[in-house]
């Protein structure tokens, strides 16, 4: 099956077949990270610029490693080192980047729709590494890959996503992706962190974490994004932990073989206890590991890759 997308802007625009192709391609690339020499010549001669206007550790580093393992020339630009701090507009930034003739731009931005804006105005491929509270497609894809590896399938699973749904681009991308692949999605959080009309995304909404977690195959905890919310949304971290934190007792309500996920960074003792975060059901580091393979797959596919078997030799 051919991948017919020049850009990766969101999961909402993808089909189930697109998602499956990305996951299958990522599986094939996982072997590269296990080699003594972790590099293949797949994207030799290609230039990838990682433009991050928001702080990031996992996503930026993961994309950088992914590009280098594919032999691409990778360049990193952060907000603090860009001309944006001097007043340059996003449109002017786009024009200047295009003048340098990159092949792929990986962008994270605090404004929803910024990667779309770039894609509409430039010839290079754009990969959305997170835009505001809109979407974070590569995170959802690595989450799906982790679930598929641990459970063997996604269709028919019950996935509970707990936390700050309003500000979570991870939640939105996961809801889109899980629905397309046939999972049942549950959302839970304080009323102030559940956006109006969230049911329209195709998820059940719960007020109590105990109800949301009960019988779940996967429990995904979300970070409290204090940088995006007002003080009135969260009375105290202690109160949040009491009513919505994931503890060993609450995990007992899920299925015995349930897995625990978190996109990171974690606030230990707030959304998740250390006992759960370090426990046997946690697959958080598996998510991080799978992030490199998924991002290798995205860079490869938007570059027009067709026969992975040939490129990975």
UniProtKB/Swiss-Prot annotation:
E.C. number(s) listed in UniProt: 2.1.3.2
Source organism: Syntrophotalea carbinolica (strain DSM 2380 / NBRC 103641 / GraBd1)
One GO molecular-function entry: aspartate carbamoyltransferase activity
Origin superkingdom: Bacteria
Entry-linked Pfam families: OTCace, OTCace_N
GO biological process terms on file: 'de novo' pyrimidine nucleobase biosynthetic process; 'de novo' UMP biosynthetic process; amino acid metabolic process
Family matches, as InterPro entries: Asp/Orn_carbamoyltranf_P-bd, Asp/Orn_carbamoylTrfase, Asp/Orn_carbamoylTrfase_sf, Asp_carbamoyltransf, Asp_carbamoyltransf_Asp/Orn-bd
Major enzyme class: transferase
Subunit text: Heterododecamer (2C3:3R2) of six catalytic PyrB chains organized as two trimers (C3), and six regulatory PyrI chains organized as three dimers (R2).
UniProt-listed PANTHER family: ASPARTATE CARBAMOYLTRANSFERASE, ORNITHINE CARBAMOYLTRANSFERASE, MITOCHONDRIAL
Protein name: Aspartate carbamoyltransferase catalytic subunit
GO annotations of cellular component type: cytosol
Gene3D superfamilies: Aspartate/ornithine carbamoyltransferase (3.40.50.1370)
Family (UniProt): Belongs to the aspartate/ornithine carbamoyltransferase superfamily. ATCase family.
């Amino acid at each position: 099956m051919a991948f017919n997308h020049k850009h990766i802007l969101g999961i909402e625009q993808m089909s189930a077949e697109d998602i499956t192709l990305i996951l299958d391609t990522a599986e094939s690339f996982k072997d590269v990270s296990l080699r003594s020499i972790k590099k293949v010549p797949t994207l030799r001669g290609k230039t990838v610029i990682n433009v991050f206007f928001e702080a990031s550790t996992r996503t930026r580093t993961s994309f950088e490693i992914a590009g280098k393992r594919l032999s691409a020339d990778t360049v990193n630009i952060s907000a603090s080192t860009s001309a944006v701090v001097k007043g340059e507009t996003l449109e002017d930034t786009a024009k200047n980047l295009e003048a340098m003739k990159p092949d792929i731009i990986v962008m994270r931005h605090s404004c929803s729709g910024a990667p779309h804006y770039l894609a509409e105005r430039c010839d290079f491929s754009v990969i959305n590494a997170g835009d505001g509270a809109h979407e974070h497609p590569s995170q959802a894809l690595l989450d799906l890959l982790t679930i598929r590896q641990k459970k063997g399938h996604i269709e028919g699973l019950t996935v509970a996503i707990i936390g700050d749904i309003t500000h979570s681009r991870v939640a939105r991308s996961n809801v889109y992706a899980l629905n397309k692949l046939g999972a049942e999605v549950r959302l839970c959080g304080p009323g102030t962190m559940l956006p109006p009309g969230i049911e329209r995304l195709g998820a059940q909404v719960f007020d109590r974490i105990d109800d949301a977690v009960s019988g779940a195959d996967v429990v995904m905890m979300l970070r409290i994004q204090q940088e995006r919310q007002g003080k009135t949304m969260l009375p105290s971290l202690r109160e949040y932990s009491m009513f919505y934190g994931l503890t060993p007792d609450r995990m007992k309500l899920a299925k015995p073989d349930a897995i625990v996920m978190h996109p990171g960074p974690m606030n230990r003792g707030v959304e998740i206890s250390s006992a759960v975060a370090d426990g046997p059901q946690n697959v958080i580091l598996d998510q991080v590991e799978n992030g490199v393979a998924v991002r290798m797959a995205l860079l490869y596919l938007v570059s027009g890759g067709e026969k992975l078997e040939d490129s990975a030799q």
